[in-house]
Amino acid sequence: MSRPERLQPGVKLRDADKVSRIPVKVVPSERETMLRKPDWLRVKLPASNQRIVDIKQALRKNGLHSVCEEASCPNLAECFNHGTATFMILGAICTRRCPFCDVAHGRPLKPDAEEPVKLAQTIRDMKLKYVVITSVDRDDLRDGGAQHFADCIREIRKLNPEIKIEILVPDFRGRIDAALEILATEPPDVFNHNLETAPKHYRKARPGANYQWSLDLLKKFKEQHPHIPTKSGLMMGLGETNEEIAEVLRDLRAHNVEMLTLGQYLQPSKFHLPVERYVPPAEFDELKDYAEEIGFTHAACGPMVRSSYHADLQAQGKEVK
């Protein structure tokens, strides 16, 4: 039996190459078997794309990445045109192979020590008042990338003292306490970590992750920073039931999470997990009502909702769906 080919630093693996060695194999979808998107899931393109071009040019100029582009988010045009972007630090190559996600897998390069300053300058030039910072998983780093998050927060606030910063962090597998100790030096305004799906579906959707670890990360941060909102996001359409999602919501509240995003999973390519169901808007509304009933201070629930979709409005408690 031949040994797997050694990953080369900086080389992006996508689609079939990315998911070739995950526990639950993904059978490439045939067009005939793929569910047809309902009319209420169509994305509306903005009338002008100049703002989109400007943001992309600013990112390229400074060698920065957005999760909007790297993960092929369907809301890219709307968010860029709105003047918002979710910056992705620590490169564009993830050490995990989650088959729902379109971010490339591989062996990442060493973190760019200049990225925190370049990010802060770009945010200043874009005159942003609210930013979301996320990252790929960096299991190759001793702290999982926590110090780089802290460095970015510090530099952003130096140049943008009035800004609000939300961070969407990985699970810091096996390094939670060390990572939180580092983040305590430069805490964000909102702490976000996505559970993504119900625990029953972790093996196929989040290989390498652990449902309880993710809950513990959220709870421990909240215990250390009781005044900072905690947030998590979930997808629907991977085979879960509404009751399974409701149970996750109860788990999140039991771990003191206050903000929620809930959206429809969309298959990035035929090599990714298939969409098993398109969830009607009315069911999202029902889950939103339930989330608020059990104590979430804000719940953004709808087919096109994503974790950082209009995050500034979410943080203000405004309706997002």
Swiss-Prot record:
UniProt: [4Fe-4S] cluster 2 binding residues: C94, C98, C101
Residues of the Radical SAM core domain: 80-297
SUPFAM superfamilies: Radical SAM enzymes
InterPro entries tied to this protein: Aldolase_TIM, Elp3/MiaA/NifB-like_rSAM, Lipoyl_synth, rSAM
Compartments, record wording: Cytoplasm
Main location: cytoplasm
GO cellular component, one term: cytoplasm
Reactions it catalyzes: [[Fe-S] cluster scaffold protein carrying a second [4Fe-4S](2+) cluster] + N(6)-octanoyl-L-lysyl-[protein] + 2 oxidized [2Fe-2S]-[ferredoxin] + 2 S-adenosyl-L-methionine + 4 H(+) = [[Fe-S] cluster scaffold protein] + N(6)-[(R)-dihydrolipoyl]-L-lysyl-[protein] + 4 Fe(3+) + 2 hydrogen sulfide + 2 5'-deoxyadenosine + 2 L-methionine + 2 reduced [2Fe-2S]-[ferredoxin]
Cofactor(s) needed by this chain: [4Fe-4S] cluster
Recorded GO MF terms: 4 iron, 4 sulfur cluster binding; lipoate synthase activity; metal ion binding
Keywords: 4Fe-4S, Cytoplasm, Iron, Iron-sulfur, Metal-binding, S-adenosyl-L-methionine, Transferase
Cofactor remark: Binds 2 [4Fe-4S] clusters per subunit. One cluster is coordinated with 3 cysteines and an exchangeable S-adenosyl-L-methionine.
EC code(s) of this entry: 2.8.1.8
Pathway: Protein modification; protein lipoylation via endogenous pathway; protein N(6)-(lipoyl)lysine from octanoyl-[acyl-carrier-protein]: step 2/2
CDD domains in UniProt: Radical_SAM (cd01335)
PANTHER family for the chain: LIPOYL SYNTHASE, LIPOYL SYNTHASE, MITOCHONDRIAL
Protein name: Lipoyl synthase
Top-level taxonomy: Bacteria, Pseudomonadati, Pseudomonadota, Gammaproteobacteria, Alteromonadales
Gene: lipA
